[in-house]
């Protein structure tokens, strides 16, 4: 595979950006490569500057559930651009998108539009603290909630990929109020509440973890979190930046039947544009300025172009939910079976999955980190050399889109099954 142009561009990028990238995992260091530079994408395919074609299972880290360059989404964005790129003012699209979200996720009675998952989570936690008048928060080892200071403690995603358990540059005081629990471990949560339950503002969790690889919740775990937070007057926040509108039209909360107090959304809700959401119970969200004293604002919040992409995407998902989600499940199950046929240890929930290179059943951060990252690098490079574009990290998810064709799935399965 010729990557001459990508290598030249990467050499230039190193002079301008740390590691030559704008997000650490993209540097591909954990898989022993330099990154590909992408020229264009359409449907299920992505094309690099050297003309190589790949079947894309990164899907921009989750947003592209409909595939790249979906015609209705492109049309909506193009039309919105004709009216101006940003207003810094109210517009009707904000209401239309909010209605679509609330209709499909009834736990979100009131919401705010922001620009990234990090911003959504940061704001949701501030709201939880303001509402409860408490400072401490509980997060889980291996769960990643963006790069705000108080949450960069044993995080997943790029932190785990690059073996950085806690980020430098974060004063100790920022994380003193962050309490760590083990994912899928009720006892570890119970101990925290036994010790200081009346000081805990919220528990934030990925209802299906997807940033230490895909790790589904054990039966009853989310229900336990709902019950213990209610008992102690704490709020339950579901970080559905990845799972929202992907595991079902109503997200993980509908799939698992557990209703959080607050939810954060990103990726799919913006249709491929920078847009995220935080929202929840009306009485909680009324704490946000100008109604309340919890402050949050943003120059580009509710950007009309991003909102148009979100509306178009959610309308397609809503209109075609009875065909899209079963189709995603069927295609994803085929790939999962191919992984199992190759002897791989796979976790899958809906259209997200991870093949873990470990003999242990992966249920939390400790078991995820037993994975052989060198073996994963071999697997990644085998896929790439055969035209399959997967995450350059053992600890990221593989995403299936509605645009993946039968031929795509068949080829992918053949390449995976050849890796033994």
What are the roles of these predicted feature ranges?
Residues 1-420:
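Conserved N-terminal phosphate-binding loop of PLP-dependent enzymes in the Aspartate aminotransferase
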């Amino acid at each position: 595979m010729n990557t001459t142009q990508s290598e030249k561009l990467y050499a230039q990028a190193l002079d301008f950006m740390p590691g030559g990238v704008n997000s650490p995992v993209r540097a591909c260091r954990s898989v022993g490569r330099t990154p590909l530079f992408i020229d264009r994408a359409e449907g299920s395919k992505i094309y690099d500057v050297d003309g190589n074609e790949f079947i894309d299972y990164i899907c921009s880290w989750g947003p592209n559930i409909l595939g790249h360059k979906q015609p209705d989404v492109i049309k909506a964005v193009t039309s919105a651009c004709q009216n101006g790129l940003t207003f810094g003012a109210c517009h009707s699209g904000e209401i239309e998108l909010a209605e679509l979200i609330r209709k499909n996720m009834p736990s979100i009675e009131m919401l705010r539009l922001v620009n990234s998952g990090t911003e959504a989570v940061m704001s949701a936690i501030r709201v939880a603290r303001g509402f409860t008048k408490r400072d401490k928060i509980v997060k889980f080892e291996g769960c990643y909630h963006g790069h705000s200071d108080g949450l960069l403690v044993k995080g997943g995603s790029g932190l785990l990929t690059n073996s950085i358990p806690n980020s430098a540059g974060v004063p100790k005081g920022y994380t003193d109020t962050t309490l760590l629990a083990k994912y899928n471990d009720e006892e570890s949560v119970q101990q925290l509440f036994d010790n200081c339950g009346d000081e805990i503002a919220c528990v934030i969790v990925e209802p299906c973890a997807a940033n230490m690889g895909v790790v589904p919740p054990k039966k009853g775990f989310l229900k336990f979190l709902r019950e213990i937070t209610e008992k102690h007057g704490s709020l339950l926040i579901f970080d559905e930046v990845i799972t929202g509108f992907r595991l079902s039209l109503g997200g993980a909360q509908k799939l698992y039947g557990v209703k959080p107090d607050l939810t954060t959304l990103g990726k799919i809700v913006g249709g491929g544009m920078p847009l995220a959401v935080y929202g929840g119970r009306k009485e909680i969200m009324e704490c946000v300025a100008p109604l309340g004293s919890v402050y949050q604002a943003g120059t580009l919040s509710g950007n009309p172009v991003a909102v148009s992409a979100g509306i178009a995407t959610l309308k397609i998902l809503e209109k075609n939910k009875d065909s899209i989600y079963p189709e995603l499940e069927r295609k994803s199950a085929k790939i999962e079976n191919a992984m199992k046929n190759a002897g791989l240890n796979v976790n899958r929930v809906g259209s997200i999955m991870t093949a873990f290179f470990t003999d242990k059943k992966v249920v939390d951060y400790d078991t995820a980190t037993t994975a052989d990252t060198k073996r994963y690098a071999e697997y990644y490079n085998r896929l790439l050399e055969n035209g399959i574009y997967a995450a350059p990290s053992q600890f990221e998810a593989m995403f299936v889109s509605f645009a993946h064709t039968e031929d795509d799935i068949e080829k992918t399965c053949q390449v995976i099954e050849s890796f033994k």
